[in-house]
UniProtKB/Swiss-Prot annotation:
Residues 1-44 form a transit peptide. Belongs to the class-I aminoacyl-tRNA synthetase family. SUPFAM superfamilies: Anticodon-binding domain of a subclass of class I aminoacyl-tRNA synthetases (SSF47323), Nucleotidylyl transferase (SSF52374), ValRS/IleRS/LeuRS editing domain (SSF50677). This is Valine--tRNA ligase, mitochondrial.
Amino acid sequence: MPLSLWRLAIGSSRRHSLLKITSTRVLPVPRPYSTYSNNKKVIMPGEDQPAAAPAAAPAAQDAPGAPAPKKNDKKEKAKADKAAKFAAKQAAAKAKQPAAQSAPKEKKEKTPALPPYEDSTPAGEKKVIQSFEHPHFSAYNPSAVEAAWYQWWEKAGYFKPESCRKPSAGKFVIPLPPPNVTGALHCGHALANSLQDTLIRWYRMKGYETLWVPGCDHAGISTQSVVEKMLWKKEKKIRQELGREKFTDLVWEWKGEYHQRINNAQKLMGGSMDWSREAFTMDKNLTAATMETFCRLHDEGLIYRSNRLVNWCTHLNTALSGLEVETKEITGRTLLDVPGYDKKVEFGVLTHFKYQIDGSEETIEVATTRPETMLGDTGIAVNPEDPRYTHLVGKFARHPFVDRLLPIVTDNYVDKEFGTGAVKLTPAHDFNDYQLGQRHNLEFINILNENGTLNDNAGPFKGQKRFDARYTVVEELTKLGLFVKKEPNPMKIPLCEKSKDVIEPMMTEQWWVRMKEMGEAALQVVEEGKVKISPESATKSYKRWLADIQDWCISRQLWWGHRIPAYRVIFEGEEGQRENEKSEWVVGRTQEEAQAKAEAKFAGRKFTLEQDPDCLDTWFSSGLWPMAILGWPNTENLDFKKFFPTSMLETGWDILFFWVSRMIMLSLKMTGEVPFTEVYCHSLIRDSEGRKMSKSLGNVIDPLDIIRGIELEDLHAKLLVGNLKEEEVARATKYQKTAFPGGIPECGADAMRFTLLSYTTGGGDINFDIRVMHAYRRFCNKIWQASKYVLGKLPQDFMPKGELDTANFSVPEKWILHRMNVAVKGMNEALEAREFSRATKVAYQFFYDELCDVFIENSKGILSDGTPEEQQSVQQTLYHALDVALRLLHPIMPYITEELWQRLPRKQGDGETIMLAPYPAFESQLEFATEAEDYELGLKCAGGIRSLAADYNIKSDGRAFIKATTADSLATVSAQLAAIRTLCGKGVKEVNVLGADEELPRGCAVYVINAEITVLLQVGGSISDIDAEIKKITTKLQKTDLTIKKQQELLSKDGFEKVSEAVQESEKQKLADAQAAKENYQRTLEEFSKLKI
């Protein structure tokens, strides 16, 4: 029996629940035929046959419903290859036959492509609705559908909180995580936009006063870095040649261009943000908030200046916080590219060398992975219990290259088993050595300049680049007979997150924030539930990090950003002196305030003030975002008083520590309140192969390319616009040819949003596949064609009723209203619980499987053959179901729902836009559970008959029977007989119901619905070789027995109960399906055996 029977056999093991049938799959993309429609997939006008999406990496989420990878892929491939060879032979044989045997078919001419759509609506006015007869609107056309609506929404003020219905149901406020002005948006931004806008639109339709504040982040390091690269690429200049003022002017130009691009993209994606309240992290109010926070924290002693060890990026010439450093693990000797070096640099090697003991011929051997740092060594540590070195404790080793003695000290930190058991100490260039240096009062000697070259303290190596010295130091040690050996060593290499330069721990004067007190407060509000973080894994990570929080280095050696409001006091006679630990500093919101503070503090002394040239860490100012965009530090600002604290922050889990925790800390410290009460962390998007998206790999996808579509050649061209190296462009081009051989088809914003939400399950990372996106574009076309059909069946004078009178409704009408009510409840529950994937599943199932594939199909017979009263009733039901369906979908798919809703006849009380229409709510009077259960039983019968007709190729004049063995089942099936006949398809012309005592006809294939009902289809006349058919079914029965045995063994295995509930349910369903199929095979064999008698 073919695969179609397997699919429909799901129903035989599940009593009367249609919901269970359809919900066993998540969203099927690409979609097989519907459970309810004809076995062949119905392709609506404008649809193409979907291509199967490949299985993605197991570590990440695939598209919901995407086919799981098969275990016998190799066997399947071999079969496919064999079939292809056979087909080729057949084609060759046909080619040799005389041409006269059949006239060649003329090739169908391709429909000429439509010219780009030009909308006639005046800018900002309500869209001029075109007829469905218009070439651009006969089928779903994203560019035509999405035109003009956003400009009207914005101009009409629908994005403002003031647009809500009165009285409001409450407030719902989201501060948009501000995108960096470093370039175009990517799919991660599109995901965030889609999730946040879905919630904003949902709450707005529910009557809430909603506010979604947009804006951009200046992104200090990232933006300065990208502009510096551009400057070098275009003019072969470095920023120092321009000077600070001209360079920052250049960055402001960049910001202006890309800020506008970002805003345009946010609008095209449908984000209903209040643009009248747009913010930028370096605008006037956010700058004031940043200065206020720095000064208050400094005055409280929480910000201090200290010469401490920091993570230093020599390529960007700036300090970094620990969160801005990533690690690369290597297992042994590895050559790596390092910015600023023509040749690869050696890592993963442990270099052994000896120090001479002062006044002795004896030596002590040490080992290091960074031999160049030995120029900064100021001590040697050994374990106090290591007998090899007991006699050397308290003595000194002599440095071979500089005039320096290194004391030999004992410390339990030293591992006797690692290396030689003796550890060289470089307190100024290693975080562990820094602590040992403090414990043993060692000298802290910095050997590096800010650019990574060696300074005067490096003796004869002065001026060399740090990794050049890695080799020259070993060469000189070898000449002196002090080099011992090299050996492979696994290690973790710290890298700058932005530049990928190897980080150097270095002693510099920086500004720091004491984090202990604020960290404890931020941890407490989460533990007390004042801030809810989801998913749970993000909560655990948040708590773990805050439990061991370190002080935060907030100064960055940059020109782009908020210049630190701190001023060094330079007293008369001390001009030209470098900063030292005795230097005096004052802070002020303005220079005038700083001057006044200094005059009060140093009364009678002459001085000048010199502002710190450094900028604040971007995350310091971004940490004030939720309150500063609403007017803080002006606590009397109306927006701040009304909308702070905000309701929710939606963001990626990867910036939970960078940003989220710091917003909570700073808000609690500055305002005494949490900045938001809910944090939802979405997954990270990877490519279809599970790789992190990177410009150098070419797998970063611009959301606008998805919305508008783009040719492959244009994708290649975009790679040349950025700062990629030639080899990176080549690698990216190669990937694009593989991933997008035909470019990216136009999908539209609605399909993109729906797809991204369908991926969002709150689990692991997302494997993004453009083919899945294109498949959901077909769902948009289904919505379009179904709406077009319904509107075409409503008379010109149709008047929708405010409330439906369901007393005389037919069972199919009650069924669709019941299913609609279930969908309404499911959508509201899913969005309330932030279960976005579930929401898309509910919406898809109702619109596609239930409204389109069942009720619309069922309605055709009534509309053509029913009484006037029945027709009017069905028209009202169709209208009501479509209206509710569009409103259900609107938060996720704003453009197509507005376009179609505007075409619906208006009922009393309707407003101007679907945006402000009430979101559907559960209605108890539309609960028809009994009628729905009866109707679903009829659907299963129709499905079973269709399946059998497809299996035995019955295309016309089919005779089907439904055997009911109880009085109740007989009555139910009989009552649904008209609907069953309608849904059986064109191949079946006759359906009869048989009672318990009536004799079964001979020569029938059998399909078991449940213990009480069986459907049969006469196939005797269509089977030429009954023995062959029996043999075929017997073979399938044997395979089914093996499947049942395998599933039973799996379910009874120890530990199976520990796997996820979803996996357990899936495996149990496989067993139920196989058992149902077995019963069908057995009954069919019985019937076919009778044909032989």
